[in-house]
Amino acid sequence: MKRIYFLVLLVFSFCQSSAQTIAEQSVRIKSISERWELADSTRKGTFLLTSYKPFYFSLGRWSSNPNRQPHSENPAYSVPTPTDYNKYEARFHVSFKVKLLQKIFWGKGDLWAGYTQKAHWQIYNTGVSRPFRELNYEPELILNFPIRYKFLGFEGRTLGVAFNHQSNGRELPHSRSWNRVMFHTSMERKNWQITLRPWIRLKDEDDENPQIMNYIGRGEVTVVYGRPRHQIYLVATHPFNKLNRGSAQLNWIFQIRNHLKGHVQMSTGYGETLIDYNHAQNTVGLGICFVDW
């Protein structure tokens, strides 16, 4: 229950801090300059909590293939007995960032701290006392630089590097984690935005998920398309080898009334959560969105 109270408190605290921003807009795509404060006109200073990735709550999420007995290529991290998880659960996705330093490295760079958390809650599963099936914690340190370039009609806006840690905070045999150095660049054109994020995994002596790169992948692309009252975005990963795994997640955010926004999500592939890094499934979720791109 403590985890439930923490998540609820986190949701309402962030909603309150973002209330003014949300109240000023419906569903619209923010420019990259707005999101990363690249120009003097968009700078808000340091230590101000702002949105990072979308913030939503899926009231219902269906899986074609629930991961009832997670396994790893490292035998110490394979679960010996299955748990009777439902195909239906709820999902939280919370994400925010804060600028720690600005105009560093010749007055061009900004240093950000980012945090993303997702939680999969078996709220409809009374048979196993409605547990949280999986929680993933993802803190980041992000060094971001403004840049100008042209690519296929798109205008490049940012270039940077980040240190990313992701874990589920659990004990053996459910523990999963990895550390990455991630490179990123973002570009935009009218109603479109594209972000590319290739990464390098850092070595882990006690590897809980040895083949994670061959399942989740070695890079990610995010494509966002925005129109009045609607926003569609795709997040895809790929290992860039002959295994042809990875994942694809398609999202639709739409205005219902005033600032109430609906959220539909469909995904396929591996690694929806860390415990599922080598488990393939198709999912569909329906809920509400508090903060979009």
Task: Label each PLM-derived region with a short phrase.
Residues 94, 139-141, 161, 181-185, ...:
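Membrane-embedded beta-strands of outer-membrane beta-barrel proteins
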